[in-house]
Amino acid sequence: MLFPPPTPELGRRRVLGLALGAGVAPALGAGTASAAAPPARPAPVRPRADSPEQALGRRVATVATAQIGVPYAWGGGDRLGPSLGFCDEENGYLDGRCLGESTVGFDCSGLALYCWYRASGGAVELAHYTVAQYHRSAPVARADLLPGDLLFFSRPGAPLHHVGLWAGDGAMIHAERTGTLIARVEGVLDLPRWAGEFAGARRPLPVG
């Protein structure tokens, strides 16, 4: 097929099209080259691992938390868990009735003994006596408390009479007295009753 010769008007259109195409192509290329690279993702922050001391303390607090709701039993508790209590002078009685001899549970030092023995796999074995537990442990400043540390209490001019376990976040887990259940006390060292009798915190030492 024969095509008619190009007219002057058709020639002008071709020239204009070529000129426009030449101007657009570099602009498209420049835009592609200068596109911003996506921002780099920050490296994930890994939580700091607990020290062996912190890890043991957390296990102690976990064992203590699992005992919440277990009855108080005067003389109750050993390294195997809750045990039958007994009555001794004024201890173990409620309203003149001996509950200790019929209650399986923990008293305050029995709870501390069990939690530390269980959590440490037997590496920490405390006596079943608050004063002995105090002397078997190292002092800890209030600002340095870790879960599992022992909190001791006494009245003015009297020996130590109570021990509880620091649970972290200002709380203590303890076995208080006959007729009660093991419980968690929030803000314990800010409560007048407990703050007024606070005799210091201690951290048990491994055997050996």
What residue ranges belong to the model's regions?
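...with weaker cross-activation on analogous glycine-rich loops/strands in unrelated enzymes
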Residues: L2, D50-A61, L113, G121-V188
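N-terminal secretory signal peptides and thylakoid transit peptides that target proteins
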Residues: L2-A22
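Cleavable N-terminal signal peptides
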Residues: G21-G23, A33-S34
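Glycine-rich catalytic cores of cysteine/serine-nucleophile enzymes that process amide/ester linkages
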Residues: G29, S34, Y72-F106, V124, ...
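N-terminal capping segments
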Residues: P39-S109, Y114-A119
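Low-complexity, Gly/Ser/Thr/Pro-rich intrinsically disordered linker/tail segments
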Residues: G196-G208
